Amino acid sequence: ILDNVQANLANLSNAHFDKGLAGIGWAINILHEQNAVCGDIDDILYNVDAAVYKEITKHDANVGLSVTDGVNGYLVYLLSRMKNPKHDCNGVQHGLMKKATMRCVDTICGQAPSLFSGLTKDIYISAIWNFPWVFVLFKQTMDLGIYTEKIKAVIQEWSHYLRCSLPYYHLNRLSLCVSFAYLNTTLHSRELEGHVDFLLSNINFAGLRREVSEKIFNMNEGWFMASHLLAMALLYIPNNKSVYSELA
């Protein structure tokens, strides 16, 4: 399968995460970390790196926040590449990926504020919802030492909007809550902890069960991702919270 994929990489022009080069490169990178792919990872993914970089930095780019076909998906790919211990952190490709990562953060910072008003009106149940991914990826970007001060300042600037944001669906509330708790393992912000407490106190876990159908098996809307969110909540939400027993 991998031989066929790599042989056809040059024929793909779509750089998106769900059906394009970014997602394929992400999968190859994970397999390389597990020693299932041999060779220099920077050579193997050279063309993918170039395609993603071009897509992110072209002047007429008009990408949304989506994981599937937007800036969050590109950021997932870039961060996974730079975290690979076998990646050359001193090479030219690393410099380009770092630049592309900063461009992604800039794009998010420019787009997100105009969308905050829709947070409370979003009637689409989705575990891979755009907004939580922003905060998950911000944390991973800071962990690599990229744009740390800018991201801290942006979170502070957005704090008022986040404090007023209560998504309509309980699954989306849990998703946003987990992303805040995960981000706060790096920021250690009392204000962000307050956002976590606010969301937790407004999650009806019985209601959450009604929102998730055991008959849906896709990762975005089904029980699999809801279970994963609950597992992440147990990892990142302090066990002294009053709702911890309900999470468990």
What are these regions (language model features)?
Residues I1-A248:
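Glycan-recognition and catalytic cores of secretory/periplasmic carbohydrate-active enzymes
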